[in-house]
Amino acid sequence: MSTADTTAAGIEHGTHVSETAAHPQPSPSKGSLSTFLSTYVFSKDHKVIGLQFLFSTLLWFLVGGLLALAVRWQVAWPWSDVPVLGKLFAQQGGQMSPEFYTMLFTMHATVMIFLVIIPVLAGAFGNFLIPLMIGADDMAFPTLNMLSYWFMWPAFAAFSASFFVEGGAASSGWTSYPTLATNVNAAPGSGWGQTLWLVGLTFVGVSSMLGSVNYMTTIILMRAPGMTMFRLPMTIWAMFITAVLQAFALPVLTAAGFMQLFDRTLGTGFFTPEGNIVNNAVATAGGGQPLLWQHLFWFYSHPAVYIMILPAMGMVSDILTCFARKPLFGYRPMVYSVAGIAGLGFIVWGHHMFMSGMNPALGVTFMVSTMMIALPSAVKTFNWLGTIWGGKIQFTTSMLFALSFVSMFIIGGLSGIFMAATPVDIFIHDTYFIVAHFHYVLFAGTAMGVWAAIYFWFPKMFGRTMNEFWGKVHFFLTFIFLNGTFFTMHILGAVGFPRRLADAYHYETFHHLQPLNAFMTYCAIGMVATQIIFAVNFFWSMFFGPVAGRNPWNANTLEWTAPSPPGHGNFDYQPVVYRGPYEYSVPGVEQDHLMQTDPPHPAAAAAAAAAH
């Protein structure tokens, strides 16, 4: 059929044909280097950029995971020869020095937070899914979209290079607290390594800001005909609210980062107090307040917690409804709860600072606001349970990961209640209880959501499905090793095991905990090794997996009306939306789902009228 015939057919069926569908892009000549670069490297197509983010974050996830194993090795068996890293850096004859240990946990957290969790959620899935799920051809600003990806690589280069400069990588924690971070002579890693850390953080911030502006504009202005805001899937609502969080919180961290950089290089004194001495190094300027950095840093970094989990919540909501074959329980309350979590996220940052010396009355205020955030979180949790209750559950790999996301989020949320109370926080502050909490929320929670999303949208990305058997093997082994690693941390934290010491067994009271740490390290090694199964399944399925149709899961949302994988312009015709995203098991309808593009169904309308 010719383009003109296709256009006419689209108009005849009551749809509007997109510009890219009516006027396809000319096919570039094969074998051209410039064509390859513009198509696969410096592409402006949202789908290619999303996959670039996905492949890059999987690489950075490997780097962050190996750094984590090195940290776990030192905690379990301090002063023993470290495999691989010991030979690579020759630290004290193959053993890890305390200074290098602090560099490792600093860079592990930096890589995992700024190069893995945030970009895989907002960058990979946000880019790939937003235009497809709202019925758009592409992002509003394709060039900015491309730049948002390429700004991540200078950040990775800066973080990586910091290991090879004089003094080594940053060692003041991913929080970069003054005055350790502002005094260039304070400790190994406080010199060029810390400066490169701040430079890398700036590039990450620019990337995130470009993405957030693009996402908000695209969702507001480029929705398909009939796609009202309350017909958007929860994935899009979560991405939209996450973009709002980034747009309002990120400038604060960026400004604070520049202020700290100026303290280090230009002699200003924003965060350095007068006469400050760290490790016999006297500060060259003074008059600043270290507490100011904490307020500015956590004003961004607590909303960043929700930037790192809200997209996963949205994607899990869509996956649960699909495989429970039921509508989402309480769609509008779910939307309002996401907005409530985001709003409260801006007024709870002080719970990270209960032990910082701030006014205790202010601490009580932050304690109350922190406990309030449990309300919208509980709404989401019970609505997820209501969604799957009584459903015709299909236990696919994606569904298993989605269900485990809910359980991991519950565990992480319950442990957070302990830390929200200032009297309790006095005892568990800076212990492994804190480490257990944020790993359950940000790794056990978010990573489970990411794996669920990969298995779910893989057919749309590559036109093939992943192997379900090996996917379930990957799930069960990951679930076992993950909980073996992180649940045990609650026990360590409850008895006061400190989180940042290279050798806590220097204190006799912790000697009996070494077997627990060894057990956790074995589980961590098993968890990392299990990802080999995922990697083989992922890349094998890309080329040899079973061919998927447009809608292998019988889902409802717009991306499943596009070809798998979608071509340039995404859709054959401009989709028109007639209904919400969760019309599963509709009374009076033979099939168990109605897609958003299905016109009003007479039988369903009659059944609804009879019900009233």
Residue ranges, per PLM feature:
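Membrane-embedded and interfacial regions of multi-pass energy-transducing membrane proteins
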Residues: 2-612
